[in-house]
Amino acid sequence: MVKDIIKTVTFSCMLAGSMFVTCHVCAAGSVVNITGNVQDNTCDVDINSRNFDVSLGSYDSRQFTAAGDTTPASVFHVGLTSCGSAVRAVKLTFTGTPDNQEAGLIQINSINGARGVGIQLLDKDKHELKINVPTTIALMPGTQTIAFYARLKATYLPVKAGNVDAVVNFVLDYQ
């Protein structure tokens, strides 16, 4: 008798489970619409803008008399070619290691590097660009050259003399 009850219960559960699965499958009737758009809104980075050096020059550490003092800015360019007909803007982010004293600046990497200064990046109008923070730049179809500037900025005194080395990458995110 106990065996019969167990068999019956087991069979009933399997039957009920099969009915549930069958009904669930019968009720499924979804539609997935997939849409998209192919645009011509990107550019190629000019070969001369892929790997290059920016010289900031040589300065006496004593010329920095207060935190916030800067050197003259050195211009550099990022060239974009073959910008598509739909291009309007790009979010450009300079990425690198932020300075320990002022997070918007780039940290000097050298073991024997200068101390008390960081590298500041500026846009074409010489407004500060913070490292690792995107900035939107208007673009037009075709070829264009975007000017940027780099300079040293004192973060604390006294500034210690040494080498100035840093690696910065840039990332383009088209809008």
From Swiss-Prot:
Keyword Disulfide bond attached: yes
Record carries keyword Signal: yes
GO cellular component assignments: pilus
Null mutant phenotype: Deletion decreases hemagglutination but no decrease in fimbriation levels.
Disulphides: 43-83
Pfam families listed in its UniProt record: Fimbrial
Signal sequence segment: 1-27
SUPFAM superfamilies: Bacterial adhesins (SSF49401)
Compartment(s) of residence: Fimbrium
Principal location class: other
InterPro entries per record: Adhesion_dom_fimbrial, Adhesion_dom_fimbrial_sf, Adhesion_dom_sf, Bact_Fimbrial_Adh_Pro
Keywords: Disulfide bond, Fimbrium, Signal
An annotated GO BP: cell adhesion involved in single-species biofilm formation
Family recorded in the similarity comment: Belongs to the fimbrial protein family.
Function per UniProt: Fimbriae (also called pili), polar filaments radiating from the surface of the bacterium to a length of 0.5-1.5 micrometers and numbering 100-300 per cell, enable bacteria to colonize the epithelium of specific host organs. A minor fimbrial subunit. This protein is necessary for full expression of S-specific binding. S-fimbrial adhesins enable pathogenic E.coli causing urinary-tract infections or newborn meningitis to attach to glycoproteins terminating with alpha-sialic acid-(2-3)-beta-Gal.
Name of the protein in question: S-fimbrial protein subunit SfaG
Organism of this sequence: Escherichia coli O6:K15:H31 (strain 536 / UPEC)
Gene (UniProt): sfaG
